[in-house]
Curated annotation (Swiss-Prot):
One of its GO terms (molecular function) is proton-transporting ATPase activity, rotational mechanism. This is V-type proton ATPase subunit F. The keyword Membrane applies. GO terms for biological process: synaptic vesicle lumen acidification. It is found in: Cytoplasmic vesicle, Secretory vesicle, Synaptic vesicle membrane; Cytoplasmic vesicle, Clathrin-coated vesicle membrane. It comes from Rattus norvegicus. V-ATPase is a heteromultimeric enzyme made up of two complexes: the ATP-hydrolytic V1 complex and the proton translocation V0 complex. The V1 complex consists of three catalytic AB heterodimers that form a heterohexamer, three peripheral stalks each consisting of EG heterodimers, one central rotor including subunits D and F, and the regulatory subunits C and H. The proton translocation complex V0 consists of the proton transport subunit a, a ring of proteolipid subunits c9c'', rotary subunit d, subunits e and f, and the accessory subunits ATP6AP1/Ac45 and ATP6AP2/PRR. The keyword Phosphoprotein does not apply.
Amino acid sequence: MAGRGKLIAVIGDEDTVTGFLLGGIGELNKNRHPNFLVVEKDTTINEIEDTFRQFLNRDDIGIILINQYIAEMVRHALDAHQRSIPAVLEIPSKEHPYDAAKDSILRRAKGMFTAEDLR
């Protein structure tokens, strides 16, 4: 019998999270904790960081998607994450385009390969 797959978690603005929820990623774990956080104007940095760390520690989550401008608020927590699972991917939002220069995870991944490896 096949095991259950891993979930995608998302931390983002209302439009981003709503889009992913409409796509079917919304789940509650056995403790009734959701796999998403809608970041609003009154959401504290501590709340974002706590949710990110909770997602990192959940064994049912395989990928964490986070709006890049929100990732900037908790960059130290993202930079401290060293495991490959859950994978953390920074994504654009409607108001903030993606900037590869700000993506520390992408920079780390690029550092793992030389030009020769990619030929």
